[in-house]
From Swiss-Prot:
Pfam families: Nitroreductase. GO terms for molecular function: oxidoreductase activity. Keywords: Flavoprotein, FMN, Oxidoreductase. Its cofactor is FMN. This is CR(VI) reductase. The lineage of its organism: Bacteria, Pseudomonadati, Pseudomonadota. It comes from Pseudomonas sp. (strain G-1). InterPro entries: Flavin_OxRdtase_Frp, Nitroreductase, Nitroreductase-like. Its EC number is 1.-.-.-.
Length: 243
């Protein structure tokens, strides 16, 4: 049953607008906390946005206003080393937070934590959508939610009862992501064109927003230029100087 749940995931962008109770939200957070965490640092915090004005501003800043408007719960998932700084002070030491390694640890911790939250939510019949758009305006979002030094927003997330469900989007074939004993680049020459055929058929036949497109073209268009070049300077301002 768990495998079936995971394989049927699709992002939900329009919800029925009914709020999810605090009891359920806290249950989902407690479940999320049981995810694996590097060296038990638990380098995550979540902003639950219940203030309608803040929710509206978040939607505008991240470029997803309708998702936030109709959702039953709106969140910003953050990498958090501020709490670890407080832990160090209790022990009379200054922790070294500003390292590239700690950024990676925080990103991994938040991602695992969030995915536990998502799977638990979907098991209860809710839909979700991750929102990377919070990194478009990270300084403004940090100010909106009073995020201190050593805390930065990684992604947003909406949850709610779906008003409409999307079809499951085909993933890359297993052979494209599973490498035995050593990395194999040559297989992409065969696998990627075949995957393009799969994605072209999906886009042409899905129930809404049909288009002519394929995966390699999407990725080429997406990665042809540097994305969010402001992030490095933003992280430095937050105390992460990539030592």
């Amino acid at each position: 049953m768990v495998k079936e749940l995971l394989r049927n995931h699709s992002s939900v962008r329009i919800y029925d607008g009914n709020p999810i109770s605090k009891e359920i939200i806290e249950e989902l957070i407690a479940t999320a906390q049981m995810a694996a965490t590097s060296h038990f640092v638990q380098a995550y915090s979540v902003i639950w946005v219940t203030d309608e004005e803040k929710k509206e501003k978040l939607g505008m800043l991240s470029g997803n206003p309708r998702q936030y408007e109709t959702s039953g719960g709106a969140f910003v998932f953050c990498v958090d080393f501020k709490r670890l700084q407080s832990a160090g002070k209790l022990e009379g030491v200054d922790i070294v937070a500003d390292s590239a390694e700690n950024v990676l640890v925080g990103v991994a911790d938040v991602s695992l934590f969030a995915q536990n939250f998502v799977v638990a939510a979907e098991s209860m019949g809710y839909g979700i959508c991750y929102i990377g758009g919070v990194r478009n305006k990270p300084e403004e979002i940090s100010e909106l939610f009073n995020l201190p030094e050593y805390v930065f927003p990684l992604f947003g997330l909406t949850i709610g009862v779906p008003a409409r469900r999307n079809e499951v989007k085909p993933r890359l074939p297993v052979a494209a992501v599973l490498h035995e004993n050593e990395y194999n680049t040559e297989k992409y020459e065969e696998l990627l064109p075949a995957y393009n055929d799969t994605m072209e058929a999906y886009y042409n036949n899905r129930s809404s927003n049909r288009k002519i497109d394929n995966w390699t073209k999407q990725m080429a268009d997406f990665l042809i230029e540097q994305r969010r070049p402001h992030i490095k300077d933003f992280l430095a301002k937050k105390g992460f100087n990539w030592k």
